[in-house]
A protein has these predicted regions:
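Bacterial N-terminal signal peptides
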Residues: 6-16
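His/Asp/Glu-enriched, well-ordered alpha-helical/loop segment
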Residues: 319-330, 335-423
Length: 444
């Protein structure tokens, strides 16, 4: 009843206060609002400029005369997807040495804009980049967020915080800040905050518990969350003891053959409200392409990338035998253990996000999110609705953007996708994003 009344009040307010010429209605269609409740059949969403002003049923909402109508009948209307783990500087090529050796000077001209476009076209309207060259990624964020390059709302970590630099980039490509000590860690987190980073990324199990504790504590003091790339159970325990906290994320959770985490690890994850980021597609993508090379001919891959880069990425799978690649082995060797551990965490009540690591090997931006959602459902036992909520509302919480995005509600930004299908029956329908609206602007 309250919901009905509030919709009505908003609708009446709309008619009197707003100029109908500026209002757009998404009319018909089933609305999944991101909160996890029953969908609204024959839904209507009114947008005024960049904001949503009403969400409800056709019977509840008056559409002012002169309103522009977008017909969404037969389709699913839901919040734009949020991916909390992407990399704008890679496009799914199988060989990082080759990629960075050849293309570091094409990041701004071609690669990052192509990644941004591919994400947005796939219905991903907000992302968190978890590690790239500092100068390029701050530039990219400002270009996209000021509207100069089409792409999702972009939040960034800047560099990986590690004990050693990454091996495959040149000296001039500053994607790593090496941590020397706990004091150094604090200083670097403060420096990143000053520079305007949105999140801190640790990517090294060699960081000591003291160094991690300094990173977590300083980041939390600065109002930043931390995403930690961790595989081994012992390293997860170290990060938990070091104070990884509420809605910080453990990226790549579930890795390795072991079929359960020790009870103390699960308990700390629950007590500290750490969010689980499984990035399953970053493990399974190579298997999918090796077993079905036709995937590299997907027209969406061709559509989103400059022709020569697409050709080079395709060649890296079509003309190289990758069956002895460690990722291919891991895809099958770790699957049973990962599934068992993810289900253990799910049953215990851990918070789950949807996190793709898109751009990594065989994990192109146009496919990452819908594939990860399907794998999440299969491997964790989450319901389709739970996965949809994780990909929208929960991910907005992780990014500290829950007041602006993540659910379809009056007052929030109009980041909305229209899916040609029914993801509550078949999550793979998320592949068929027909329209993408970001901030009230229709991008496709
Ligand atoms: Zn990553």
């Amino acid at each position: 009843m309250f919901r009905y009344l509030s919709c009505l009040i908003i609708a009446l307010f709309t008619i009197s206060a707003a100029n109908a010429v500026d209002i757009t209605a998404l009319k018909g269609g089933r609305i999944i609002d991101g909160n996890g409740g029953a969908p609204i059949v024959d839904g209507v969403i009114l947008m005024d400029g960049e904001r949503i002003i009403a969400v409800g049923n056709e019977d509840d909402i008056n559409i002012p005369t002169g309103t522009k109508i977008i017909d969404t009948n037969g389709m699913t209307v839901m919040p734009g997807l949020i991916d909390i783990h992407v990399h704008f500087d890679i496009l799914g090529h199988s060989d990082y040495n080759h990629w960075f050796g050849k293309y570091e000077n094409r990041m701004r001209s071609d690669i990052m804009p192509a990644a941004a476009k591919a994400m947005l076209m796939a219905g991903v309207t907000s992302v968190r980049d978890l590690g790239a060259d500092v100068s390029n990624i701050f530039w990219l964020r400002d270009q996209v967020n000021s509207g100069k390059i089409p792409g999702p709302r972009t939040f960034i970590a800047g560099p990986f915080l590690r004990k050693t630099a990454t091996a495959f980039v040149s000296d001039g490509y500053k994607d790593t800040w090496v941590i020397e000590s706990p004091e150094d860690a604090r200083e670097k987190v403060r420096k990143l905050k000053e520079m305007g980073a949105d999140v801190i990324k640790t990517q090294d199990e060699a960081l000591s518990q003291e160094e991690l504790a300094a990173i977590y504590d300083e980041a939390h003091k600065q109002g930043l969350r931390v995403a930690s790339h961790i595989y081994a159970a012992e390293a997860i325990r170290t990060a938990l003891k070091a104070g990884i906290g509420e809605y910080d994320t453990i990226e790549h959770i579930g890795e390795y053959e072991a079929t359960a985490y020790d009870d103390d690890i699960v308990q700390m994850i629950l007590d500290q409200k750490v969010a689980m980021a499984a990035t399953i597609i970053a493990r399974d993508g190579l298997r999918q392409i090796i077993e079905n090379p036709e995937l590299t001919d997907d027209p969406r891959w061709i559509r989103d990338l400059p022709a020569d880069l697409y050709a080079d990425v395709r060649k890296s799978y079509r003309e190289v035998d990758l069956t002895d690649h460690p990722l291919y082995d891991k895809a099958s060797a770790h699957r049973a253990g990962r599934m068992a551990k993810l289900r253990q965490l799910k049953e215990a009540g851990a918070i789950f996000t949807v996190s793709t690591d898109s751009g990594t090997r065989a994990n192109p931006h146009h496919d990452a999110m819908w594939k990860e959602m399907v794998l999440m459902q299969e491997e964790t036992g989450m319901t389709n609705m739970e996965v949809l909520v994780a990909a929208t509302k929960t991910n907005a919480l992780v990014m500290q953007q829950q007041d602006k995005i993540g659910t379809l509600e009056a007052g929030k930004l109009a980041d909305i996708i229209i899916v040609d299908g029914d993801p509550l029956s078949h999550l793979s329908d998320m592949r068929r994003v027909k329209h993408v609206i970001k901030g009230g602007v229709l991008f496709r």
